[in-house]
Design a protein with these regions (language model features):
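Active-/binding-site microenvironments in catalytic and ligand-binding cores
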Residues: 1-155
Length: 155
């Protein structure tokens, strides 16, 4: 394939947190059937993600999200990249957040057999590089069906 051209990325990310966010997104998709986060703010110390949900998850569900994310992290899955043309993206990859001016060549990030997502961000090479995941708070805005979760990685 010819040399790939990617859109410029506008921020420096903390790879363990960014990869944890991908695992969290796939966990939410699997547990609730919702889209990946509609809004995310990923930082080294703590991060947040917003999800469109019909109801606020119960405390048991919140604990289960945390447990499942940590279970995936503990599997020591490889993180790999592949470059594909937009028309060749597998159907399970959601492109709704892709900007209109995105290049024709996309980079897909694969976390073992757990997640596959178009992304230009930085990631770890293996989930063994991610510290345990902890949900630190969450709230639900009924008017917009938005569940906001704040999380961190153990230090």
């Amino acid at each position: 394939m010819e040399e790939s051209i990617l859109n410029a990325h506008n921020k420096e990310e903390y790879p363990p947190m960014h990869t944890a966010e991908h695992i969290l997104n796939q966990t939410m998709v699997r547990m609730f059937g919702c889209p990946r986060s509609r809004n995310a703010h990923i930082e080294r110390k703590k991060s947040k993600c917003d999800y469109l949900l019909d109801a606020c998850p119960s405390e048991e569900q919140v604990q289960e999200i945390e447990r499942r994310v940590n279970e995936v992290i503990a599997q020591h899955l490889p993180v790999s990249y592949e470059f594909v043309k937009r028309g060749e993206v597998p159907p399970e990859v959601d492109l709704w957040k892709l900007p209109d001016d995105a290049s024709e060549t996309l980079r897909l990030v694969r976390i073992g057999d757990y997640d596959l997502c178009a992304c230009v961000g930085t990631h770890v090479q293996n989930t063994s590089e991610i510290a345990p995941f902890k949900i630190i708070s969450h709230d639900y805005i009924a008017d917009t069906h938005t569940w906001r979760m704040r999380f961190k990685l153990a230090e």
